[in-house]
């Protein structure tokens, strides 16, 4: 009888450990912190380095009517970067071919015209069959745990909490310094 109890106890412990590993991997899979991408200079950018920071991810373009949003993005980045907030830009040429340049050309444009200092990643696709993994995460509820979304245009914003969990999708036409975004950053 003691042997049976010992075996049952061992089985229970093993099953508990297996269940815990599934729970922890499920939590990690709902976080942006699992991704590594290349920045605009080709260096590896590890989203795990953003743990403890609120994150705004935005797809950008240099020849769009919304391109002046770079100015507001940079202003809020400068104001809040030392307060556990970061913006990560992803140039994309998916809408009206409004980001035709190379990574080097995009970097020069952003620096020269808007003084961009927030992290910019290499040019990616944010929709369709070539969609990058970060945007697959951001747009699929099964991956992000919040909602399915479609990137509607350049400068759509995704807001993630300090654990890297998606909390809100913001329309491209909503300005980066909109009151609701500033309140989210500050609270």
Predicted feature descriptions by range:
Residues 39, 59-63:
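Amphipathic alpha-helical repeat scaffolds
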Residues 66-131:
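Structural microenvironment flanking redox-active thiols in thiol-disulfide oxidoreductases
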Residues 9, 18-30:
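Bacterial Sec-dependent signal peptides at the C-terminal "C-region" and cleavage site
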Residues 1-11:
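Positively charged n-region of N-terminal signal peptides that target proteins for export
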């Amino acid at each position: 009888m003691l042997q049976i109890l010992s075996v049952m106890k061992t089985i229970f412990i093993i099953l508990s450990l297996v269940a815990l590993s599934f729970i922890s991997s499920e939590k990690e899979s709902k976080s942006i912190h699992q991704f590594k991408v290349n920045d605009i200079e080709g260096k590896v950018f590890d989203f795990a380095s953003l743990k403890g920071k609120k994150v705004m991810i935005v797809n950008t373009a240099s020849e769009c009517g919304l391109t002046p949003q770079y100015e507001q993005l940079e202003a809020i980045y400068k104001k809040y970067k030392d307060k556990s907030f970061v913006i990560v830009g992803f140039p994309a040429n998916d809408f009206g071919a409004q980001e035709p340049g190379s990574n080097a050309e995009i970097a020069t444009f952003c620096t020269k015209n808007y003084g961009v200092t927030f992290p910019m990643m290499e040019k990616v696709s944010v929709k369709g069959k070539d969609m990058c993994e970060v945007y697959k995460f951001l747009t699929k509820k099964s991956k992000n745990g919040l909602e399915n979304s479609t990137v509607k245009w350049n400068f759509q914003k995704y807001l993630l909490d300090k654990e890297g969990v998606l909390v809100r999708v913001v329309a491209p036409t909503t300005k980066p310094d909109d009151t609701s975004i500033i309140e989210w950053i500050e609270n």
